[in-house]
Amino acid sequence: MGRTWCGMWRRRRPGRRSAVPRWPHLSSQSGVEPPDRWTGTPGWPSRDQEAPGSMMPPAAAQPSAHGALVPPATAHEPVDHPALHWLACCCCLSLPGQLPLAIRLGWDLDLEAGPSSGKLCPRARRWQPLPS
């Protein structure tokens, strides 16, 4: 009887690994420093650095309807209730299956309660609990 070729029997050779790291979370934004050999050629900017002058200027204060200057948006927006946390997470992570649960939580709980112990990051639109 002949054996049928199965891809599961194939073994990878130990020396045939790719030189490109497969951990995209190891970047300058994550705070985890990758080894020097991953950062590119010495003297050249790494792949995580942007060209100088490419960043947007900081947002300036906007004039409001009553003439006073309104400061730019703060880094975090407060969230009124934990039910809104579920709503924000579902919208951010694109989980429509959890959306009815979030709406039900919002109906069952009194949304006029005091502020919760977390804040919503406007950039990521994800719930971030406050450090205790």
Curated annotation (Swiss-Prot):
| Keywords in alphabetical order | Cytoplasm
Q: Which cysteines are joined by disulfide bonds?
A: none
| Major localization listed first in the record, in broad terms | cytoplasm
GO CC: one term? cytoplasm
Q: In which tissues is it expressed?
A: Expressed exclusively in heart.
The record's subcellular location field reads: Cytoplasm
Q: Which InterPro entries match?
A: DUF4620
Which residue stretches does the UniProt record annotate as biased composition, category Low complexity?
51-65
Q: Name one Pfam family in it.
A: DUF4620
Instruction: Say which domain of life the source belongs to.
Output: Eukaryota
Annotated spans, Disordered: 17-75
Name of the molecule in the record: Uncharacterized protein C11orf21
Q: Which gene encodes it?
A: C11orf21
